[in-house]
C-alpha cells in the first residue's frame, strides 16, 4: 500500500468533500493499486497555492486500459473518503 499526495482543483475537491464525487480520473504515473491512500489537497490555480483543505481517501477499485475505454496512460480510481482536515494554508509545492 502506498500513499499519494495529489493536487485537486476546487470544483473537484468540493464535489468529493460533499460526497457528490466518488471517482478520480488521473494520469497513471504513480502505480496506483487498490488499497492505496490518496492525500488530496485543494489547490487554487489562480493563486498558485494550496487552500489548506485536505481529504484522505482510499482506492477501492480501479480501471486501466481498454476496459471501459479508459485512454492509455490514464486510470479511473474509485475512492472512499476517510476523512478531511485543515492543514497549513498557503503552502506552495516543493
Residue ranges, per PLM feature:
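Short, basic/aromatic beta-hairpin or loop at an interaction surface
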Residues: 1-22
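A structural micro-motif recognizing beta-strand termini
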Residues: 26-29, 80
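Short, charged beta-turn/beta-strand-edge "cap" motif at the junction between a beta-strand
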Residues: 43-48
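Short coil-to-beta-strand transition motifs
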Residues: 49-58
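Glycine- and charge-enriched low-complexity intrinsically disordered segments
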Residues: 50, 63-94
Amino acid at each position: 500500500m502506498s500513499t499519494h499526495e495529489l493536487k485537486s482543483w476546487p470544483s473537484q475537491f468540493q464535489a468529493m468533500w460533499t460526497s457528490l464525487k466518488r471517482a478520480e480520473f488521473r494520469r497513471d504515473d504513480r502505480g496506483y493499486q487498490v488499497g492505496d491512500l490518496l492525500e488530496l489537497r485543494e489547490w487554487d490555480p489562480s493563486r498558485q497555492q494550496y487552500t489548506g483543505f485536505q481529504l484522505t481517501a482510499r482506492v477501492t477499485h480501479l480501471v486501466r486500459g481498454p476496459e471501459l475505454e479508459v485512454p492509455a496512460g490514464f486510470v479511473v480510481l474509485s475512492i472512499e473518503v476517510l476523512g478531511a482536515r485543515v492543514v497549513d494554508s498557503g503552502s506552495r509545492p516543493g
